[in-house]
């Protein structure tokens, strides 16, 4: 019998309300988004400016839009430097978060501690996923669509949240980097924003059926544990387009969608970029 136990310190309501609200201002840049661990922020500088965060250069779109993301365990502050027509330096204060502890029982043990003969496959698949996320797609139109706000790829109960420390069958494993939506196998998965498919694999060891959707400039969404894929690599999809169906493939104890997001090599929280989860539609009489 599969059992789930969730010991949680919830994300503060204030943190979620910060989504897409102005965060900070200086003489040259106003930031929007969520300036916290797992958050994504964006703003506009003079076109042609050079922007860095802690010395790492950021992409600057032709209209001056620039984006930065912060991982689960980001430091408490980061230095933003803008050089160009309107130079400035700004210290970004990054809000810390407390994360859930989630105990999951009943997972097949070979997906918790894989046998030696599985390790080569796991390594190969990690490289495949890494390559798909590392592709550089210079599409300002896709990124602008994403920054206008993501839609939920599936509507339903949230059964797992970003950042949780996962304990499988009593064994601590890596944190969970996505948000889980628990719905039956076959439930449609829709593109939360426009993008280009960079990975479409029906059976990866941990994530089962998996799609990666590139939203431009190394901002991407991943969709895990799918039962059926409706897209292929290289295909461009629009917001709301059917891309897959929910399943229980890979390391899963039941049917659900695991939606993840990455900016460069930082894993960010999709829930901070989406509106509150809508109520499921009432069944037809």
Positions of predicted regions on the chain:
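Positively charged n-region of N-terminal signal peptides that target proteins for export
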Residues: 1-4
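Bacterial N-terminal signal peptides
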Residues: 8-20
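Cationic-aromatic interfacial patches
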Residues: 24-98
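Surface-exposed, glycine-biased beta-strand/turn segments
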Residues: 91-207
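Residue-level recognition of beta-strand microenvironments
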Residues: 161, 184, 200, 226-229, ...
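Zn2+-dependent peptidoglycan hydrolase active-site motif and core
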Residues: 177, 192-230, 255-257
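Short, well-structured beta-strand-loop connectors
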Residues: 188-199, 231-246
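Conserved, short, structured surface segments that act as functional micro-motifs
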Residues: 209-215, 219, 235-282
């Amino acid at each position: 019998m599969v059992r789930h136990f969730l010991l949680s310190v919830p994300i503060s309501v204030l943190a979620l309300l910060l989504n897409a609200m102005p965060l900070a201002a200086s003489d040259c840049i106003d930031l929007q988004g969520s300036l916290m661990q797992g958050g994504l922020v964006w703003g506009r500088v003079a076109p042609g400016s050079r922007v860095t965060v802690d010395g790492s250069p950021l992409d600057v779109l032709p209209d001056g839009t620039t984006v930065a993301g912060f991982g689960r365990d980001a430091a408490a502050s980061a230095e933003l430097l803008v050089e160009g027509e309107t130079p400035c330096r700004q210290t970004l204060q990054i809000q810390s978060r407390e994360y859930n502890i989630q105990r999951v029982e009943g997972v097949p043990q070979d997906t918790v501690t894989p046998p030696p003969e599985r390790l080569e496959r796991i390594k190969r698949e990690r490289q495949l996923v890494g390559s798909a996320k590392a592709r550089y797609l210079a599409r300002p139109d896709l990124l602008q669509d994403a920054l206008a706000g993501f839609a939920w790829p599936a509507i339903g109960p949230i059964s797992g949240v970003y950042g949780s420390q996962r304990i499988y069958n009593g064994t601590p494993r890596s944190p969970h980097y996505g948000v889980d939506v628990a719905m039956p196998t076959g439930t449609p998965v829709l593109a939360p924003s426009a993008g280009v498919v960079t990975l479409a694999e029906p059976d990866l060891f941990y994530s089962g059926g998996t799609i990666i959707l590139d939203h431009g400039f190394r901002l991407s969404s991943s969709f895990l544990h799918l039962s059926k894929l409706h897209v292929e690599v290289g295909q461009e999809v629009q917001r709301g387009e059917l891309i897959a169906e929910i399943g229980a493939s890979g390391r899963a104890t039941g049917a659900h969608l695991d939606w993840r997001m990455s900016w460069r090599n930082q894993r960010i929280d999709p829930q901070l970029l989406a509106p509150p989860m809508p109520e499921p539609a009432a069944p037809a009489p």
